[in-house]
Regions:
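Cofactor-/ligand-binding subdomain signature composed of acidic, glycine-rich
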Residues: 1
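HKD-type phospholipase D/PLD-like phosphodiesterase module
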Residues: 4-39, 43-164
Length: 164
């Protein structure tokens, strides 16, 4: 007997696009944040305090300031180098913000769960899901070696499951 590893009850009415590293990805994330009307759920492992990271954080702050309920979950280890000033500006913006699972040491062993999910979802209708973090080095431009990674943009009823 074969046991399927993945089972999915297909529902019509959704659309999926593939994004590659770099500007197609970061541009789509910024556009999704800028067009959100009701809420944004944003979680990632790493966001650097560089041009790319600040671009995305600024978009989240703009959304919160225009009244979009904005939730931000960052991995405590992957974002440990963010400055206190940047973290304070996120806190002060109205974004509902938390760090996931700070590492701790017990009996000489470090225990740490990491948040490697990268999900940006807006209004329960559109989500971007993938492996890319938010930093300049994830642009993967031909002139400079970078990460080559992918994400999918999902639109439609499948996003309801992400919101649940």
């Amino acid at each position: 007997m074969k046991i399927p590893l993945y089972r999915h009850n297909y529902r019509g009415g959704h659309h999926i696009d593939l994004l590659q590293s770099g500007e197609p990805f970061f541009g789509a994330v910024e556009k999704l944040i800028d067009e959100a009307k009701h809420f944004i759920h944003f979680q990632t492992y790493l966001i650097d305090e560089d041009k790319t990271g600040i671009r995305i954080i600024d978009a989240l702050i703009r959304a919160a300031k225009r009244g979009v309920r904005t939730y931000l979950l960052l991995d405590a280890y992957g974002t440990k180098y963010l400055s206190k000033e940047l973290v304070d500006s996120i806190d002060d913006s109205g974004i509902l913000f938390r760090f996931f699972s700070p590492a701790f040491v017990t009996n000489g062993f470090q225990l740490s769960l990491r948040l490697h999910l990268k999900v940006v979802m807006a209004d329960g209708q559109t989500a971007i899901i993938g492996g890319m973090n938010f930093a300049d080095r994830y642009h993967g431009t031909p002139s400079k070696k970078g990460w080559l990674d992918f994400a999918v943009v999902v639109r439609g009823p499948e996003c309801v499951q992400l919101h649940a």
